[in-house]
Structure formats: structure tokens, C-alpha cells
A protein has these predicted regions:
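Membrane-interface helix starts
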Residues: 1-6
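C-terminal transmembrane bundle of multi-pass solute transporters/carriers
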Residues: 7-15, 19-178
């Protein structure tokens, strides 16, 4: 179970940056209004749906561990793209990839959590997984907001990508071995 909770924790702590910073990025960095912000989140949603449908195909050619690792790297690269972009098209591509990565990581780790424990503790294991996600969103979001306020949204997004790679990759290396 710990083999799935640690990657969930690492990914969500870093990935919470986009949830808190996108409402600021849309108007400040891209000059978008409410409809532009909605468009970026719609692209996230489209990416999530396509990502969900791609998981079975990915699992036919790669292990669950490799799928999660690839999606984690995709998220980090997508965040860097959003941070570096001054154009809506690039930010939309980044949010699309983020959506695909988000659902791939969380669905895969949730499935792994459920299948790694006996049936009599499955509900508790899923609950622990959900608590890890929610706790990281609750803790990570204000942390990324404070960093963005002290520096810049671009710096905070890039830092979250760096943190994801620094903390996430070692936890995923452990995950790959288990």
C-alpha cells in the first residue's frame, strides 16, 4: 500500500500548483477573461477524458509503473510549457497534457492501490489514497500560492515541476522496484 501512497503524495503535492495558479495565470500571464480561463480548464478536461481512454492501450504495451512515470514526466513538462507560454495556444496545449497526466496518474495509482490489498481492507486503502490526495491539495495549494505571491506564477509553476521531478522520481523509482 505504501508503494502507491508515496507516489500519490509526491505527485499531488507538486501538481496542486496548477489548480491554484491557473486562475492567476489566465488573466495576468495570458490576458484572458473568465471565458479564456474556462477554455483552459475545458482543455484540461478534454485531456483528462482522452487520457482516461488511453490508459488501457498504454497498459497493453507498458507496465502500470511505466505508465505512471511517463504521465508524471508529462505533467512536469506541461507545467513548464504553461509557465513559459505567453500564448493561449501553448497554455491550452499544456493544460490539455496536464489533464491527461492528472487522470492517468491518479486512476493508475488508485487502481494499483485497490488491487494491492485484500478485499477486507480495500475500502480503507482507497480512503487512505483519497486522504493523501486531498491533504496534498489542501497543503500544496496555499504553499504554491505563497511562492507565486513572493516571486511570480511562472517561477512557482517551474518550481513545482522541479519539485515533482526531485521528489517524485525517487518515489517512483521505489514504486518501479515494488
Amino acid at each position: 500500500l505504501r508503494a502507491f501512497i508515496l507516489p500519490t503524495f509526491s505527485f499531488t503535492a507538486a501538481a496542486s500548483s496548477l489548480w491554484v495558479l491557473l486562475p492567476v495565470i489566465a488573466p495576468d500571464q495570458l490576458g484572458l477573461g473568465a471565458s479564456g480561463y474556462g477554455f483552459l480548464f475545458a482543455m484540461f478536461g478534454v485531456g483528462a477524458v482522452i487520457g482516461a481512454f488511453s490508459i488501457p492501450r498504454q497498459l497493453k504495451v507498458r507496465s502500470l509503473n511505466r505508465v505512471v512515470l511517463s504521465a508524471t514526466i508529462l505533467w512536469a513538462l506541461a507545467n513548464v510549457l504553461i509557465a513559459a507560454s505567453g500564448h493561449v495556444a501553448f497554455a491550452a496545449a499544456g493544460t490539455f497534457c496536464s489533464g491527461a497526466a492528472w487522470v492517468t496518474v491518479h486512476a493508475s495509482l488508485s487502481t494499483g492501490t485497490q488491487s494491492s490489498v485484500p478485499a477486507w481492507v480495500r475500502a480503507r486503502a482507497v480512503g487512505m489514497n483519497l486522504v493523501a490526495v486531498q491533504a496534498c491539495l489542501a497543503i500544496g495549494s496555499p504553499a504554491w500560492g505563497l511562492l507565486a505571491a513572493a516571486t511570480d506564477t511562472r517561477v512557482a509553476l517551474a518550481a513545482s515541476s522541479a519539485l515533482l521531478l526531485m521528489l517524485g522520481l525517487p518515489s517512483f523509482t521505489t514504486f518501479l522496484r515494488n
